Amino acid sequence: MANLRFEVVAEAFKKRPVEVETPKVRPSEYFAKYVFNRQKMYKYLPSDVYEKLVDVIDNGTRLDRSIADAVAAGMKLWAEENGVTHYTHWFQPLTEGTAEKHDAFVEHDGKGGMIEEFSGKLLVQQEPDASSFPNGGIRNTFEARGYSAWDPTSPVFIIDDTLCIPTIFISYTGEALDYKAPLLRSLHTLSEAATEVCHYFYPLVKKVQTNLGWEQEYFLVDESLYSARPDLMLTGRTLMGHDSAKNQQMDDHYFGTIPERVQAFMKDLEIQALELGIPCKTRHNEVAPNQFELAPIYEECNLAVDHNMLLMSLMKRVAHKHGFRVLLHEKPFAGVNGSGKHNNWSLCTDTGVLLHAAGKTPEDNLRFVVFIVETLMGVYKHNGLLKASIMSATNAHRLGANEAPPAIISSFLGKQLTDLLDHIEKADKDELFALAGKKGMELDIPEIPELMIDNTDRNRTSPFAFTGNRFEFRAVGSEANCASSLIVLNAAVAEALENFKTRVDALIAKGEDQTSAIIDIVREDIKTCKPIRFDGNGYSDEWKEEALKRGLDCEASCPVVFDRYLDKESIEMFAKTNVMSESELKARNEVKWETYTKKIQIEARVMGDLTMNHIIPVATHYQSRLAKNVEGMINIFGGEEGKKLTARNVKIIREIAERTETIERGVEALVNARKVANKIESEREKAIAYHDTVAPKMEEIRYQIDKLELLVADELWTLPKYRELLFIR
């Protein structure tokens, strides 16, 4: 084992970029090559079936089962032309990954042979075993039946030889067991609520679409080095490891030249992603060494979520091909930035109006203010719930550190919009207003044209920032399913818009002019949601004190934050918006607490194993070597001179002894804390026990191990060090 680290380091240095064959046509020509999109539908489906299916996708009408067989036949024909032999219902259970079971296109022909078959029934509905997925007690082990049902709004795609059909996943009794079902409900409710409010300004609007543009951050680690780090393999993060002397302090990695091997990986990934219809746009180095980002063009929210889940799976496949492992954990390395997934969220009407963008007329700008303020109302009322939606055992490592948004939800608007809302709040009732357009900025450099400066700056410490025509939810974790946070955001804003319309209509019913009524309610809401607006430094201690005074949720314990899902206001909001029932919320919380416990439990077990089987043996081996050196020196030089010459080694021997003893006691205490926690029956209380008693002991052990790493001879240390993991590319 002593030489394994050096073997894998040498192996990593030998690796060269994998050659990637670039398609000989433009990206636009192979985009969505393996997606059953509208062009394929038009080609492979009868015209009447095509029209009905498009109506389902565009207008949300119920799928007519009578066309299912024709759709399935067209899909099968297209799939077989692409070498497909199997199909699967592809869904997103509460594991935060995806799930699939592959079935072949074969049935008995009744004559002792087989025929290829794929019916509408198989396309529309399947029955996976629901008892083996996280369900929070909704299903007992002996109650295995669950249903997966086709989501026609997200196109079918091909991976290898399998036709993948995006589906929802529900229990036998109808409760959602996935992320997609409540996401679709939230999108439907938000569209209805936003459309009703739009009718004050644009009577012809029929629906409002929610758009999402995510920014996926990730780390790449050489596969050889990864294989020599059991903690990375089993938990997704390093449980020990001293900082590299150089990490990100020079700011030289962000937007730097992309390393050759990484560039080959990115190129391969983008080609395959484009073929699957994922509109990749941007790639670059991130702040930390070996950290990178990929971002697509924004899409309709449901499709964007599916594409993000598909991309994370694809990244792992492509990374392996290039001799890398992709790390999606929010904090794989201590001492350098973790990874997030900014969610750029916006609303757009079917007539092309961006509802969070300012317009050119007073009417447009009043609409703009209404949607800004009602979004803030939803975020303010449910700020604790929004925090719960992005909280996890992994993301908790990142939030609140001086690298990511704090664990207090607030919204940054920028000076101009803040001044505007303050002006409306204090202005005379009938005063009209208009927002200025972008202002030019002369750079005094002849070769550079005038820049058009946005009316909003950026505040990287803000979890929910307005960025010109959208809001950027920055607290979402890198390995999370975006749907978790968007379900809450969509439902909260839908509720706010519904409440807004109810109050405006009440004033109109009393005889007040529509514009006057809208301004009255907007001014009232500007005052109400003012505590959520914060343009300062979210990292400061002063903000934590101020947030408490404002009544914002400042709880930092992950298991306790999950309680927000079961607050009366949350249950009522989800019920009113028809997004989730109380039983679904309770079940999901059970899953969240159980998942939190299991992740910390696994980390604790891995740490105990590595400590006793790697760290302690290596440290004591080095200690013994030093002891022999001391003994030999004293024999050669005699008493006083020998003691003087060996004083440094004796000091190291003593420090190793003290630290290993502390570590061994720490591991024993860690095991005992786990035993106590494991006896707790309540999933909530067990998760809290793991948070309060188990996780802190791991940090104490890590501190001692990282100190030992600096003491023990480099040639003996068996685990690849941070400098190797972060700088070998």
Predicted regions and their residues:
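Short linear, low-complexity motifs centered on an aromatic residue
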Residues: 96-113, 131, 229, 236-238, ...
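C-terminal amphipathic alpha-helical interaction region
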Residues: 524-729
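Flexible inter-domain linker/hinge segments
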Residues: 7-9, 21-42, 188, 192, ...
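Active-site-proximal loop/turn and secondary-structure-junction residues that shape catalytic pockets
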Residues: 67-71, 91-93, 121-122, 169, ...
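Active-site core of metal-dependent hydrolases
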Residues: 30-143
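Active-site proximal loops enriched in glycine and acidic residues that flank catalytic Cys/His/Asp
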Residues: 67, 91, 119, 296-298, ...
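N-terminal hydrophobic targeting/anchoring segments and the immediately downstream early-domain regions
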Residues: 2-24, 141-155, 162
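Glycine-rich, acidic/polar active-site loops that bind/position phosphate-bearing ligands
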Residues: 143-328, 337-340, 347-590
